[in-house]
């Protein structure tokens, strides 16, 4: 699956900004059929970072959300600014 089709867009809320600052996590809308492994590979390829962990959930509306924990060497705030969140 194409990395640009896996990652749809980042989430922008107060809770998401707290996760970026405190836990070094990004929160993203992703393709419904994307696996955790595909999400990890897409983030690593598109943003040149090391991903520690990916947690996913499917919302009641039928969309998929991914919580991506970056390694300690990479800064989630830097990636968020590259995505245009800051």
Feature annotation, model-predicted:
Residues 1-86:
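Contiguous, often N-terminal, cationic amphipathic patches that form binding interfaces
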